[in-house]
């Protein structure tokens, strides 16, 4: 009872006072903040912190007391008392925690001797990161934030190769000749050859250095494996926590067998993740007693230091091991240079201190955004304090980012504090930067961080352990209850082909498709993230995946789940590009001048000074096929010294223009880096380019590449030519003038030693500035192709959008008019459809490429027959609008549903309008009956719920009609396009999507021959872009008011049609 009274007292003190809200209101606020938070008790408990209060206990010592609950309704409350150093854990109301220890009378006590608290357990941090935080927490946090800033080194490559040789040997043999063979094979693998290329190393030198280690491998195997008696093994000192304190710590350790290699373990229990180099079965011989343990074996290739960082990694791996098996109580640390192995006991003190470090790091990573004390505006938070160790900082890989963040972010704060001894170093690292550069860095860091923390943009890894597969299947991002079938096929080292099928029945309806990245887990608790890879093929009965681990080592009865791995929230690449932009290099300075300081781009005066004499005839021949604006674009690019912007208005042949530009640059002998944000955009250009027999190298995962382009991928060329030497790989990289990849693929080794004459970025107006930056570092000049009047970069976070994150680099640089060329001649829309966009957006600049294009109408082979049937089934006098809609010579109309009526429905799944959906399906059905191919019809709606309803209705009668959002239709076209605007209400409620005039512009420029718009005019007039469009349509008498309950009469007509 005493504990419960204490709980009530704490509720009075902190829950009310600390929150500064009445308890009920504060609880509601917490619940609203975590509507989908999963809470639970038991071994995998997850508690929500309701209140925090720091008090002095009866002994006068400080305690931190937490009111916690594992109940979603917040009814059942418990108390957690933190004592000793646990008081320093920066836990706050609203935090999620996991507790290890015992709970008595609804009270947990965590102190120096017993129990652990894990802060934000869903944030999985690697053991390597935590170990590195021992000397400098700031460096560890920066390394997690600016991942791509840690450079590859010779030592890292040697270490990776040696790890692999050892791991292969422990499953084969440590005989000298076998080790030589394994080393030779490993050094020939493409991924290692690529790193040698990146670092400009000699393959023979690497081979020799690796071979120098091999005698130590033999020594270790001789010492710790395959002995006759237990006393033959070296003596060691190891006391396990479970040992009797009187036991002698001297023992002999025997490595019996390897259990796993690179075992991947995710632990939401301890908030950790990692890959254990080798998991081994070990016998500990102590006198006449023998204990058997399964332990982590950590391999180190550097100096034999037995350092605290190395030992800490091993201790953390023992915690990870507990997710899969009994507590190993210790691990092993092996230095490959000498063959010396150390046992590392994992006692409570070490685990406690490391988990406290993990909590500090998690807090810094979780709280990357703060509110300024004075102005209450959102800002980046301070990082852990800069240490006062000049020697340590001198060799730190994050020193540049550390100094940059300090000067650009922290020193702008009211409470900034920097050690005086470090000020000269910070100045030295950042003195080349202007205030405008620092502000650009700070702003984009803030916007990227806001976007990454957006509720809709967070990685959903935690759903793997929080949500059952059956629940996740409803969203289409998961397939559960899978069993492995047939043998696993080894495609190459590190890639394994697996076939899965559902244990009961067919594969459920899913959004997963070939090329998607997936995480494979076991349905059983603790088998999270067993492997990662790609979906290779999916059909009604099987899913084929290419994975990075061989799962056949698991029992045949193991049930698996596949979860789609979302990548849209990955800010590693853009933050890395931002950091690179601030470096003190020639390329970075030039880009800062152009992009941040808006230096005017420069141009060459005469084309003759650019064009090689022997290329002039070829270029002239290519130019003949272009219209005037396209020829102007070619000339502008050739004359540029810095950059060119090509505005590709709808239907103006943007892809053809880029393909032609590449052909001209190729003919002139220029090297070209061709990029875009999506794989499909890159491949669309390459498909056209391939027809002209121009060679190129396509970088990127082959699973993401169009089948017709896969023969040009690095992976396929290396396989077909059996490239196993650095010389052959260099020859491949140097043989192609044209290299193509996505903007996210710029970490490829080829870019470490290659600078291109030109970089062309397609879809540039849709790409976020820091992502678009990436490829520009590797070219002398760049060409951005896009149209800022169409879709901008996708930004989910409203605050980031308000700060300017949706401004693309294309839009930013467009103010320099001298660099801009507009493509205005379009070949898609007939003149009536084109006039809408001209009026709404382009101020009359768009023109049809020919009379044929201007006058083109839909060809409905059976239109006369359908017209007769409509007149028979529908009273023409009651439906005069019906014939007008289907008349080929009426390309544009807006159907006003105000009188029908067609009210919207707002539900949990989103906004929809069933009446509009029925009308859209009716119209589609008549067009198909009149002779239009379903594949020539496109249906656009702004809301996903509306798409689902239309798809469901169409599935009953018509297939192959593409139903999608505006975003998915960018760059596409159809003969007939029907647009459902959905919103229709009496209270003036408006949504965000229809306020975007750029989306509207895309929607009305997808149709070639007929555009039918459907919506409620009074409701849509609340949206300024639509109001402007509706006024124009009204002036042209293109708005048709549908009669009352028209959808019902049309459904009867459709029923009669279908019965026929």
UniProtKB/Swiss-Prot annotation:
Catalysed reactions, as listed in the record: ATP + H2O = ADP + phosphate + H(+)
Superkingdom of the source species: Eukaryota
Cofactor section: [4Fe-4S] cluster
Record annotation: effect of changing residue 277 to A: Abolishes ability to resect DNA in present of BLM
GO BP annotation list: base-excision repair; DNA double-strand break processing; DNA geometric change; DNA replication; DNA replication checkpoint signaling; DNA replication, Okazaki fragment processing; DNA replication, removal of RNA primer; mitochondrial DNA repair
Amino-acid positions noted as binding [4Fe-4S] cluster in the UniProt annotation, renumbered to this chain: 136, 393, 396, 402
E.C. designation(s): 3.1.-.-, 3.6.4.12
Residue sites binding ATP per the record: 648-655
Subcellular location: Nucleus; Mitochondrion
The keyword Electron transport is assigned to this record: no
Protein role: Key enzyme involved in DNA replication and DNA repair in nucleus and mitochondrion. Involved in Okazaki fragments processing by cleaving long flaps that escape FEN1: flaps that are longer than 27 nucleotides are coated by replication protein A complex (RPA), leading to recruit DNA2 which cleaves the flap until it is too short to bind RPA and becomes a substrate for FEN1. Also involved in 5'-end resection of DNA during double-strand break (DSB) repair: recruited by BLM and mediates the cleavage of 5'-ssDNA, while the 3'-ssDNA cleavage is prevented by the presence of RPA.
Subunit organization: Interacts with BLM and WDHD1.
Protein name, as recorded: DNA replication ATP-dependent helicase/nuclease DNA2
The species this protein was found in: Homo sapiens (Human)
